[in-house]
Amino acid sequence: MKPTINPARRSFVFAGAAGASLTILPALIPTAFGKAPMAGSQAISVHRMKLGNFEITAMLDGYIDVPPTVLQADQELVKMLLTQGGWPAAPMRLPVNTFLVNTGDKLVLLDAGGAKLIGPGAGRLPQCLTAAGLTPDQIDEVYITHCHGDHLHGTVTPEGGRMFPNAILRISKADLDYWGSAVEEAKAPENQRGRWMPAKRAIAAYGDRIKPFNLGEELTAGIKSVDAAGHTPGHSCYMVQSGTARMLAIGDTMHVAPVQFPRPEITVAFDWDQAKARATRKSIFDTVAADGTPIAAVHLPFPGIGRLRKNGDAFVFDAAPWQLF
């Protein structure tokens, strides 16, 4: 005869078993050993890649917050483009990247970030160098794209000394003549004269270790200046080449990726010559999109390296894949 179980009795038995399990369950839950305070800031960011026989190290000095109103365009259009790109409408948090080139013979730093003088979010370059296994006194030369603070302040210590004590500082003659000029500073509105401070600090710290160059000049084997005037009078890009492999460090040819890639005609308020900056950007974008030369940009999301391709009158940026080696 097949035994039967009263449904009410079965429910009682199961409920009782479940209750017993629940009474002992807390004792079986382990303590959460992984609990830790939130870091509250981005990790020190360093990325290496090979370029022919050269080694490129991208380093994130930090960021600077700027309002979208610096973009010289209808603000509804700006807001739409920022939203489409997944960026907050305000403020725009622009990365500040630097790039170190190891040629095998020397270490050349392309721009030096802004230290804490451009805001609390920057000034991480020294920690980046440490993470890369380097020290500031190993840097042989520093090539500055232009004399704005987010590129030049990082060459000087808070005390006014040389951040890179053994380095030669290279700045285009056109930029140095302008930003190092008390006459030009005096011409500017009083509320803009602070823009001359980065060059004055660098000149005081490096003195005769500053070696000006002419736009278009080769500065060392494998690194050549490229005339990109417009954002500043002597704004220089740098073509880095090893064998057939090359990369163009474009400095501030562009600032805001989701706006200026689809609409390269849009300038920023701090362009020295708006029309020239616009023409330079379009020319450089057209060239690198046509020949496939990778770009390295100070204000692209880290590590800031990739290729452009044309899409009608717009451009699309394809970030370079991370190299594992």
Outline where the language-model segments fall.
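Conserved beta-strand hairpin/beta-sheet module of binuclear metal-dependent hydrolase folds
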Residues: 45-132, 237-254
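Divalent metal-coordination and catalytic microenvironments
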Residues: 53, 101, 111, 139, ...
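Metallo-beta-lactamase
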Residues: 35-36, 123, 130-131, 138, ...
